[in-house]
Amino acid sequence: MVKVYAPASIGNVSVGFDVLGAAVSPVNGELLGDCVTVEAAAEFSLTNTGRFVSKLPAEPRENIAWQCWERFCQEIGKTVPVAMTLEKNMPIGSGLGSSACSVVAGLMAMNEFCGKPLSDDRLLTLMGELEGRISGSIHYDNVAPCFLGGLQLMLEENNIISQPVPCFDEWLWVMAYPGIKVSTAEARAILPAQYRRQDCISHGRYLAGFIHACHTRQPQLAAKLMRDVIAEPYRTKLLPGFSEARQAALETGALACGISGSGPTLFAVCDKTDTAQRVAEWLKQHYLQNQEGFVHICRLDTAGARVLG
């Protein structure tokens, strides 16, 4: 029996649309992510459990965990009969890399169970492919950090999909999910087909400056450069209360605040525990919209997906 945990992730991290992603885990030790368990069986079966199980597709073959098993077997050239259990702890359409969690945990669990026939690079390629089935296009900014951990920059050159970017251990990432759904497809459709030259220049400056500041250990500069001119100006209209929440977080002392992935989850970066707690409390009171919403104070998850048992 193999059980794999795959952590939540922040796609884009404001400044790196489709090319930056960060894995996060709550500081209190709670698991913010999905688990997949695989054990030997006479034939394949899939069982769904977890807090958000009701949000999964009713048709089993539409479940991404089923598709992970099917694609993995196709890749290794044989059918592996297993009993698979998906523990769905992540809300769907949350901007926390929910589908990436299921994909990463599912493929990694199968690979571990079968004695690691696939390399990490090949696994990551398959993860991007399967994630693309859900979001409509192949992008690695959730699956790469979820699988490998930390802050990852997508390169997709010289057979390198992503590489780690050094980040700041003192940073706390306050994650607030309001309890509503925003589909990735809808959030992409709202973006313009073309951008002004000035926005392109600003985007290049912010992203290059952020990566430089990370490598040269300048946390204040890095946080200042976490600006999004590509998606946030357009997506805020899909996120009730985001602009007010962002302003409140910054006024409370957050170094930066942005949309996690395509939303509706937001993240706020703080460098002091008491600031993070105050930001978290404000978000609990004002940004959450129903009982499904939650706020977690997190750190970067540098381990990525891992075997729990």
UniProtKB/Swiss-Prot annotation:
Its EC number is 2.7.1.39. The keyword Chaperone does not apply. GO terms for cellular component: cytoplasm. It is found in: Cytoplasm. ATP binds at P91, I92, G93, S94, G95, L96, G97, S98, S99, A100, C101. It catalyses: L-homoserine + ATP = O-phospho-L-homoserine + ADP + H(+). GO terms for molecular function: ATP binding; homoserine kinase activity. PROSITE patterns: GHMP_KINASES_ATP. InterPro entries: GHMP_kinase_C_dom, GHMP_kinase_C_sf, GHMP_kinase_N_dom, GHMP_knse_ATP-bd_CS, Homoserine_kinase, Ribosomal_Su5_D2-typ_SF, Ribsml_uS5_D2-typ_fold_subgr. One of its GO terms (biological process) is threonine biosynthetic process. It is an enzyme of class 2 (transferase). It holds the Pfam family GHMP_kinases_N. This is Homoserine kinase. It comes from Cronobacter sakazakii (strain ATCC BAA-894).
